[in-house]
């Protein structure tokens, strides 16, 4: 194996990259410079740029037709350049609640720990598809989420930049300004987390479970305790009741559970803080991917039974009568007739 250091200080397997780019070039007839633009991204893109790539955004940035961009990443997956992920994204906070390598592993119901909310997934709502560089071609730090810093884990691994506030700022960027403390805690460990509390409220959050505390902060509430004990244990958070006034306070946090946690304390502007409604930048929905012929050709095992138990919100019903279908089966055989019927429906889908 030949390894080279790229300009962005990334280790690339040059032999595999070249072989797989050749396979991608041969997959179909591409528009000029489409594959070279992808190669440039693979060689010189940052770790963030190669993680959960949105092919619709890539198309816009590189002046490529959306359909060709989707085909590009699908064929790149077949060639082994990228891995494809199906993600359940919370509509309230843009948290990637769950991520799957296969559509078959998706389920209909999901729970967002950050919002304490439950949702039902649909292929055209909450389910998006992204692409991440294969670790066999180039290693990026997001391939090992357990080794990420607490900051990277929350703001790049957990939250997607696709959720945008009414003023156009990504929610993940706005949320960074609320964080006062953010740390990883191993099982059995303890940490004294000091916060300079302001009017509003303090939210303590384990980013992988429902464990949290919510403490209003207001003037005239009495003496603020210098230390507030907090215990995290198996998805639960136990903390002493405290009257918090503006000023410095130390939270004595102990992870009594058996798993590591990423724990943070956020300063909310008011005790009744309501997160603004998000809208999402265009992305590749599960429904659109399933309607893409390249996906149906290259990932046939994913298509079979793909929509079992998964809703589609926007549906058009078409009633079609196949005249003489029984005679067709008898004349040319079951398999050939089945293929003809499938082509009939494919023509309808493509219309």
Which ranges hold each PLM region?
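N-terminal alpha-helical interaction blocks
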Residues: 2-81
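Long, charge-rich boundary regions
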Residues: 120-211
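Catalytic NTP-binding/metal-coordinating core of nucleotidyl cyclase/transferase enzymes
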Residues: 302, 306-351
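Cys/His-rich short segments
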Residues: 78-147
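Noncatalytic modules at the cell exterior or secretory-pathway interfaces
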Residues: 196-206, 242-261
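Key residue(s) within conserved catalytic/signature motifs
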Residues: 199-201, 209-221, 293
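Noncatalytic accessory or regulatory domains flanking protease catalytic cores in secreted, cell-surface
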Residues: 191, 225-248, 254
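Regulatory cytosolic signal-relay segments
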Residues: 243-245, 254-313
